Amino acid sequence: MAAQVSEKLQDLHLNGLNGDAKSNATVIGQTEAGEAEDDSDDEKEDGNTAPEAGAGGGAYLHVWVIFEMPVSQALGMLAYNSRIPAAKKKKRKSKKKKKGGAKVQSSPPRVPVSNLFPNNQYPEGEIVEYKNENSYRTTNEEKRYLDRMNNNFLQEYRQAAEVHRQVRQYAQKTIKPGQTLTEIAEGIEDAVRALTGHQGLEEGDNLKGGMGFPCGLSINHCAAHYTPNAGNKMVLQQGDVMKVDFGAHINGRIVDSAFTMTFDPVYDPLLEAVKDATNTGIREAGIDVRMSDIGAAIQEAMESYEVELNGTMYPVKCIRNLNGHNIDRHIIHGGKSVPIVKGSDQTKMEEGETFAIETFGSTGKGYVREDMETSHYALIPDAPSVPLRLSSAKNLLNVINKNFGTLPFCRRYLDRLGQEKYLLGLNNLVSSGIVQDYPPLCDVKGSYTAQFEHTILLRPTVKEVISRGDDY
């Protein structure tokens, strides 16, 4: 019996113990001195294997009980001990690697939307089926095939639209009275550049993506085409009605959308009138629809509203000399106009075209004129070749061609590129018919104007309101 016990003890490799139960009790639940902890996750656990020396405290506890009992009991204990599972080794939890790319937008917006949608599949806009004689397009196989062929075209538009939505929703939350217009405009423009991934400081970069045109911040009676020039100190006031109109583009696919901000609920009926008119225009637009029919529907919706200001009721009037327009690649104003009043234009919308449906309402005369300092400019597509005598004009034209092409720009954009003393050359390009200037457009002073706008795509099968969002 004693020999059997001795053999069992040798099998357990206990010859390193000193025989003092008290001194060895400290090793219960510990590894032997000098034995490193094993973090391998691959080692198999075997429930039928006796614990190795130093593998854990269980073996030591049973061993020291053996020296205090008769041999028969000791052998029984050894038999029991052989069935105890080996002490579990401490496993180190492996840290999961974080996947690259942010999953949410930052505040202020600075994460490119391509990081948020790594598969380059961007949310589609509002899908509206065609009606009347075009209702067949939704299920027509030939049209569906044509629609599938345009996937890259659609994804570029949808990416630009997602940029616009994220930037404007941040702007709506953060713009407050007391901010300068320069601060507001640059905040929006910086966000668009960051989210498209194109800062526009290197030659040609702005042609790949970024601002589709300068951020317009037209106040009160000014309806359109106002953005601050360098040195502008104008501050947004509590009683102001501000139109925020900006574009984002990817590879020249421009998404043009605008909204109006107020900080006094007295202007709500004015905003409701214009929003209703814009949505009416979107609803009526479609393949083979005549422009005159769209304008008549818009006017009827707009002019059914009135607004009370300081105890006086004002009818909301369409600004009759402002229009929506089609959008071509890298060209914000194509050759077609979408009127917002009844007229005789028999031009039709066509399959594959992109339109900016925008409406303007006013408490004034409903007619705008050029006023105030010009800030918006654009190279005229296919402008005739004209000899330029001013070297400053030649140099500036080169800068415009390489950085903007036919995309609109403003003076602040030239400042940002490091251009200096360019005004004389810029005016020479305008007078030569190479560059078009776009002065601010204003109704009578004391009146209030509002604007809402969306970009729509006339796809072969459906109409997609590409810039639609939860906000408007």
Swiss-Prot record:
It comes from the Eukaryota. GO terms for molecular function: aminopeptidase activity; initiator methionyl aminopeptidase activity; metal ion binding; metalloaminopeptidase activity; metalloexopeptidase activity. The keyword Hydrolase applies. Binds 2 divalent metal cations per subunit. Has a high-affinity and a low affinity metal-binding site. The true nature of the physiological cofactor is under debate. The enzyme is active with cobalt, zinc, manganese or divalent iron ions. Most likely, methionine aminopeptidases function as mononuclear Fe(2+)-metalloproteases under physiological conditions, and the catalytically relevant metal-binding site has been assigned to the histidine-containing high-affinity site. One of its GO terms (cellular component) is cytoplasm. It is found in: Cytoplasm. Its cofactor is Co(2+); Zn(2+); Mn(2+); Fe(2+). Keywords: Aminopeptidase, Cytoplasm, Hydrolase, Metal-binding, Protease. Residues 34-45 have a biased composition (Acidic residues). Residues 86-101 have a biased composition (Basic residues). Cotranslationally removes the N-terminal methionine from nascent proteins. The N-terminal methionine is often cleaved when the second residue in the primary sequence is small and uncharged (Met-Ala-, Cys, Gly, Pro, Ser, Thr, or Val). HAMAP family: MetAP_2_euk. This is Methionine aminopeptidase 2-3. It comes from Aspergillus fumigatus (strain ATCC MYA-4609 / CBS 101355 / FGSC A1100 / Af293) (Neosartorya fumigata).
